[in-house]
From Swiss-Prot:
One of its GO terms (molecular function) is metal ion binding. Mg(2+) binds at E274, N276. NCBIfam families: purD (TIGR00877). This is Phosphoribosylamine--glycine ligase. Coiled coil: none annotated. It catalyses: 5-phospho-beta-D-ribosylamine + glycine + ATP = N(1)-(5-phospho-beta-D-ribosyl)glycinamide + ADP + phosphate + H(+). It comes from Deinococcus radiodurans (strain ATCC 13939 / DSM 20539 / JCM 16871 / CCUG 27074 / LMG 4051 / NBRC 15346 / NCIMB 9279 / VKM B-1422 / R1).
Length: 415
C-alpha cells in the first residue's frame, strides 16, 4: 500500500514509523530529516487542495493527516472529493477540537461529563465572570493553540491577564471553567464514526518543569499504559467515547479518525478536559510503537467506514517518552543548535519533532525538538531505556523532565 502522511513533527514520525514497520511504501509532506530515513519526502505547498492533488498525483491509497491545523483547513474533505481515502475527521467534525466553546456546548447537549464552564466572546463579560471565581481558575483560548492555550490561574489577577492576552486576537473566544482534581489520562480511539478501538491509556506531562510546575507546553513526556481500572474504562467507553460518536452522527457530522479524549479521573468519575481530533503529540510516540497490527490498513478501513476493532492489536509491555526541548521553550525557543543523535536500538528510538538540516548538520528548528521513546516489559524498564538514550544525545542546553511517571510512583518521585 502507498501511504501519504501529512505533517512534520514527532507525531508524524511515529505514524511513518508504524506504517513502514508494516511494510508499506510511505510518502510524507513536508516531513523532517528523521522521517526522511523511513519515507520519501515530498515538497509541496501545504494548502488543502494542493495536498489533495498531490495525493492523487502520487497514487496514494490512503492519506493520514497528522496536525490539527490541516484537519481544520479541510484536507480530509479535499481528499475525499478526489476519491482518495483520508484518515481524519472532516473540517466540520474537527470543530470538536478547533472550537472549545462549541465543543463544550456539544458535551452539554449530549450529556458527556465535563467541568462546569461558561464561554465568552467579549473581554468585559469574561473579566466580570472571572472576578466572581475562586482560584484556581481554568482559562482556555477557544481556538487552536497547539496544546498551549490553557492557563491554570492561581489568582483572579492571573486569570484576568490570561483573558486580556486571549482577547488581543480578532474574533477571539474564551472558556472559563471549574478546576478539576484527579489523575489526568489520555484515551485515544481509532474510529470509523461508529465502531472504535481504544489505544492503551497514557498520561502526558504538560508543564515544562518537574513536579507539574511552570508554563504549559505541548507535552514533555508520556507514560503508557497508565493504570485505569476496568470499571472506569467501561464508563469512559459508554459515557464519553460512545456518546461522543453518537452525538456527532446525530448532528450530521460523523467523526472518523482519531478521537482523543483528554480526561480527568475525578472523585465523581471520568470527565472530559478537552477533545482533540487527531493523535496526541507526544502520545503518538508512546502508543504507536506498541501497535502490533497495521496502522495503514486500520486508517484505510476507518476512512471507508469499515474498521474492525478486533484487528487492532497492541503488544504487551509499556512505553515511555521523554521530550528534549530547546532552551527558552516554551516562550522563546532557541533554534539552530547542532544535534548529535546516536543510533536507535530495538527498544529505544528517537523521533524527530523540530529538526532540520543546515550546512550538512542536523540542527534544532522548533521548541520540542526530539521525542525519545523507550519500550520495556514494565514502565520502569521503558523509562530507563528512554532516559538512557536521551542522555546519549548531544544537544547543548536541552530541557527535559526527569520525573516522567511520577504520578504513579515512577520517575524517581512518589505519587
Amino acid at each position: 500500500m502507498k501511504v501519504l502522511v501529512i505533517g512534520s513533527g514527532g507525531r508524524e514520525h511515529a505514524i511513518v514509523d508504524a506504517c513502514a514497520r508494516a511494510g508499506h511504501e510511505v510518502l510524507c509532506t513536508p516531513g523532517n530529516p528523521g522521517i526522511a530515513a523511513q519515507a520519501r519526502l515530498l515538497a509541496s505547498p501545504q494548502d488543502a487542495p494542493t495536498l489533495a492533488d498531490l495525493a492523487v498525483r502520487e497514487g496514494a491509497d490512503v492519506v493520514i493527516v497528522g496536525p490539527e491545523a490541516y484537519l481544520a483547513a479541510g484536507v480530509v474533505d479535499e481528499c475525499e472529493r478526489r476519491g482518495v481515502p483520508a484518515f481524519g475527521p472532516s473540517q466540520a467534525a474537527s470543530r470538536l477540537e478547533g472550537d472549545k466553546a462549541w465543543s463544550k456546548a456539544f458535551m452539554v447537549r449530549h450529556g458527556i461529563p465535563t467541568a462546569q464552564h461558561r464561554s465568552f466572546d467579549t473581554l468585559d463579560a469574561a473579566l466580570s465572570h472571572a472576578a466572581t471565581q475562586t482560584p484556581p481558575i481554568v482559562v482556555k483560548d477557544a481556538g487552536l493553540k497547539a496544546g498551549k492555550g490553557v492557563t491554570i490561574a492561581h489568582s483572579v489577577a492571573e486569570a484576568e491577564a490570561a483573558l486580556r492576552e486571549i482577547f488581543t486576537q480578532t474574533g477571539a473566544q474564551a472558556v472559563i471553567e471549574d478546576f478539576m482534581t484527579g489523575q489526568e489520562v489520555s484515551i485515544l480511539a481509532l474510529t470509523d464514526g461508529k465502531r472504535y478501538a481504544l489505544t492503551p491509556p497514557s498520561q502526558d506531562h504538560k508543564t515544562i518543569y518537574e513536579g507539574d510546575t511552570g508554563p504549559m507546553t505541548g507535552g514533555m513526556g508520556v507514560i503508557c499504559p497508565f493504570p485505569v481500572g476496568e470499571e472506569q474504562l467501561n464508563i469512559i467507553r459508554r459515557d464519553i467515547v460512545e456518546k461522543t460518536l453518537a452525538g456527532m452522527r446525530a448532528e450530521g457530522i460523523p467523526f472518523r479518525g482519531v478521537l482523543y479524549a483528554g480526561l480527568m479521573l475525578t472523585p465523581q468519575g471520568p470527565k472530559v478536559v478537552e477533545f482533540n481530533a487527531r493523535f496526541g503529540d507526544p502520545e503518538a510516540e508512546a502508543v504507536l510503537p506498541l501497535l502490533e497490527s497495521d496502522l495503514a490498513q486500520h486508517a484505510l478501513d476507518a476512512a471507508r467506514g469499515q474498521l474492525d476493532p478486533a484487528q487492532v492489536r497492541f503488544r504487551d509491555g509499556a512505553s515511555a517518552v521523554v521530550i528534549l526541548a530547546a532552551p527558552g521553550y516554551p516562550a522563546e525557543p532557541r533554534k539552530g543548535i547542532v544535534l548529535d543523535i546516536p543510533a536507535d536500538s530495538p527498544e529505544a528510538k528517537v523521533f524527530h519533532a523540530g529538526t532540520t538540516e543546515r550546512d550538512g548538520q542536523l540542527v534544532s528548528s522548533g521548541g520540542r525538538v526530539l521525542a525519545v521513546t523507550g519500550l520495556g516489559e514494565s514502565r520502569e524498564d521503558a523509562l530507563s531505556r528512554a532516559y538512557a538514550l536521551a542522555d546519549c544525545i548531544g544537544f547543548v542546553g536541552a530541557q527535559l523532565r526527569r520525573d516522567i511517571g511520577f504520578r504513579i510512583g515512577l520517575g524517581g518521585k512518589p505519587n
